[in-house]
């Protein structure tokens, strides 16, 4: 305000000065004119005064008119200049005012912390974090665009702050929703991955079980072929019905029972076996093994508790895996029921035997009779259940269960015990029916073979011996058949015999042989003994010959894969090495030539080549025109899977090459049944350091020999 007032005072002073000067000028002009006129005309003084006053009045009026004209011009100029000033400066003024408002709002809205951060502690390194930033250029731009000043007030800033915080809350909420959705998605993916892994693991377990199942069948076939039968092999043979002419005549569950064979029958049986061996002239090994397996089955003396537990595990495995047909499932389910029953009875008998041997009282629970089943009623129960088919037993079970549910059964405990016995009788009836069906199929197959051109010849002596002894043993055990087939734990007579045997003498009981037995001629017995020895020697020779004539086990692919894994991936400069560099050695006669058939070992070799950048090559070659490659090392993998003496590792030797001094021969020697093998390699000095790649090991039937050549550096 002071500057504007001072300017106005200066302008008014200048205007007054100009007016005074103009008035003084007019007076001087009038004075000169009067003086001139007085000289010329010389009017009277009064008239001159009047004229002077009128002229002064006229000049004053004209000067006032001139001054008014000049003042009007100055006012119009001032008005136009003030108009120009408002157009230029209003924007600057408004922007400054808006900036002041924004600064005032920022100062008023200043806080101590922003989102938990302060000026002293924040991860951004900003010491003015709590102060609101005023963007002056943006405010000027907004004012130019016509934004009202109310938008820069404290109220507007608070409103914008609320909108920003609302948007921040929305962003936080969306972020939390995305995090929850991401966590849920990751959980679902992890669940899917676990399900996939569980399914893969289940498939692996299933494949592993199938593999073990196949291996168990292979082992069973080997034991059957070699005459080392186990109970599970007999049960599998009952179900499968092998292609040979041998088949089991007894029911499958008879593997659990104890056979009683007299000593005389056993001796007669041994003599008959010897005669069959002589008749076969030790040529038909399959007949001998077949006879031995039949002997093992006919003279089976029952299973121990440990054998039954092992048999139960085998049956359980077959029940889980051998489910190709409903008949197989029924067969193994019935066998598991019979096995559980027999295992429980065997454990019961063992407990009684242990108590009897120790002189202790048997446990009360073992001596107690089954509730509702008196010993005198056992025969009636056996008579009720024996001889019925599986369907009849199922119908009887349904009838008893309906009576128990309706309450019409008079003796509930008795019928419950009968139901318990029904399970084992149903299982045995099912096994009988399946076995009968297998026998019918076998007979049908025999009839077809007899009608065909390729009839299978069976040794008549073998058939006669087996049939006669089976009939004799069956006649002997006919009286004990009911006891053997009955599910009753221990018969009273058997217990009495065992008690008498334990309490009395342990001398063998005198057994009378059959009247048809003949005396043994010493000469004939000696001949038979020599014949048996010849059979054993012939078997050994035949087995050795088959082993030598047989082809090596098909493990070459696996050995090659192992060698490739040991050598690693092929690098630049590696190449397959062997067939062209193999040296044909002179034929040799080894000391083991008469025992084993010599064979050449398989191999899988590599040669490593590369560039040697010495001073000469660096001078005359570059990477675009490289020097010729040179051999830098070898990797030998010689396969000896069938080595007789696996303890003694194969060796290698370096020999001179008569054709060239730049090459030499490396010979590999292992022993029977492999011949020596040699290769022609570059004659250079080797690196024997393991850090430089040297390796010489013999493991898992593979001889690994890896080496590189030394690199000689030029030194002054």
Swiss-Prot record:
Residues 46-61 have a biased composition (Basic residues). Keywords: Coiled coil, mRNA processing, mRNA splicing, Nucleus, Phosphoprotein, Spliceosome. This is Splicing factor Cactin. Residues 25-45 have a biased composition (Low complexity). Residues 468-500 have a biased composition (Acidic residues). It is found in: Nucleus speckle. Interacts with At5g63440. Residues 10-22, 81-95 have a biased composition (Basic and acidic residues). It comes from the Eukaryota. The modification Phosphoserine is found at residue 450. Residues 1-104, 466-525 are annotated as: Disordered. The gene is CTN. Signal peptide: none annotated. Belongs to the CACTIN family. InterPro entries: Cactin_C, Cactin_central. The keyword Iron does not apply. GO terms for cellular component: nuclear speck; nucleus; spliceosomal complex.
